[in-house]
Swiss-Prot record:
This is bZIP transcription factor TRAB1. Residues 1-23, 117-142 are annotated as: Disordered. Transcription activator that mediates abscisic acid (ABA) signaling. Binds specifically to the ABA-responsive element (ABRE) of the EMP1 and RAB16A gene promoters. The gene is TRAB1. It comes from Oryza sativa subsp. japonica (Rice). Residues 1-13 have a biased composition (Basic and acidic residues). It is found in: Nucleus.
Length: 374
């Protein structure tokens, strides 16, 4: 397997791949077309040297350094007016890493790629046997490989089906040497087709689109998110996506649960894989809670009404008893006045009789006169 030739074929098939299948994204002159050595020197020129070799980085750190270089390039080339109008280029979140791949270093991934490429290269050399012995092909080093080719072979991104077919058709074209990074205008870098920039302009500029792992093509029926996402120096477009959850294809090396916790999430999901399910269940819970609150309020209102009615009844009874008490007191006073006015003489006569006859009248009683004769 000729790794260098594979990277050149990708660049040679850019113009032809733009016209077939899904809308490809412009990446001509982007960070991804640089080799590791050129990228290292570019970081040093931007003042963003990490002080650390790429081989000792893990894949998460490599992607973060690529995003940092893109942001630095966009900020250095954008004018103040364009930055105020367009908001600037934000860090791309279209690349996700499987969890098993994010913890590996670049050297470990490169050794795995070399082991995978060795049997294929040996079979290709043996299949072309004949009278003359072929010269052994020199395998490219890590520093000579472009970032895009490394990410594609490592399984981080995968090429579009239409772009791959166009790349095979344009394999006879002369290779294009890597160019220096031109100034990028923020006015032409955007997310989605918002203005007058269309996919035809990106195709005329020699654009090739590639999408991250787990983003399905429209021709595949795996219920993945349909659309493409890429990073380029000319234009960036993102097609509308379907947020239904599905399993990744074979290039994703697993389902969505293996995504790196440190990698940015490219698209929002309406559902969740683990934990509580959202949607109808949440609406039912909220509705039950609202009904319970309404019932509690009605019960409290009824209790307050009963208490108020009982209090008013007690107050009315107390008022009635007070009125009856006042009437009885008035009657008692009237009776006392009548006794003082109408019975004073009777009382005097009774006193005089008691003085004159201290013993009172003689009491009558039965006396025994005779006894029976016997």
């Amino acid at each position: 397997m000729d790794l260098k030739d594979g990277g050149g074929s990708e660049r040679r098939g850019a113009a032809a791949g733009a016209g077939a299948g899904a809308a490809p994204l412009a990446r001509q002159g982007s960070i991804y077309s640089l080799t590791f050595d050129e990228f290292q020197s570019t970081l040093g020129g931007m003042g963003g040297g990490l002080g650390k070799d790429f081989g000792s980085m893990n894949m998460d750190e490599l992607l973060r350094s690529i995003w940092t270089a893109e942001e630095s390039q966009a900020m250095a080339s954008a004018s103040a007016a364009a930055a105020a109008a367009e908001g600037g280029l934000q860090r791309q979140g279209s690349l996700t890493l499987p969890r098993t791949l994010s913890v590996k270093t670049v050297d470990e991934v490169w050794r795995d790629l070399e082991r995978e490429a060795s049997p294929g290269a040996a079979a290709a050399d043996g299949g072309g046997g004949g009278g003359e012995q072929q010269q052994p092909r020199r395998q490219p080093t890590l520093g000579e490989m472009t970032l895009e080719e490394f990410l594609v072979r490592a399984g981080v991104v995968r090429e579009n089906t239409a772009a791959a077919a166009a790349m095979v058709a344009a394999a006879a074209a002369p290779p294009v040497a890597p160019r220096s990074i031109p100034a990028v205008n923020n006015s032409s870098i955007f997310f989605g087709n918002y203005g007058g920039v269309n996919d035809a302009a990106a195709a005329a500029a020699g654009a090739m689109g590639f999408s991250p792992v787990g983003i399905g093509d429209p021709t595949m029926g795996n219920r993945l998110m349909s659309g493409v996402a890429g990073i380029g120096g000319g234009a960036i477009t993102v097609a509308p996506v379907d947020t239904s959850v599905g399993q990744m294809d074979s290039a994703g090396k697993g389902d969505g649960d293996l995504s790196s916790p440190m990698a940015p999430v490219p698209y929002p999901f309406e559902g969740v894989i683990r934990g509580r399910r959202s949607g109808g269940n949440v609406e039912k819970v909220v509705e039950r809670r609202q009904r319970r609150m309404i019932k509690n309020r009605e019960s409290a209102a009824r209790s307050r009404a009963r208490k108020q009615a009982y209090t008013m009844e007690l107050e009315a009874e107390v008022q009635k008893l007070k009125e009856q008490n006042m009437e009885l007191q008035k009657k008692q006073e009237e009776i006392m006045e009548m006794q003082k006015n109408f019975f004073p003489e009777m009382q005097k006569n009774q006193v005089l009789e008691a003085v004159n006859n201290p013993y009172g009248q003689k009491k009558r009683c039965l006396r025994r006169t005779l006894t029976g004769p016997w």
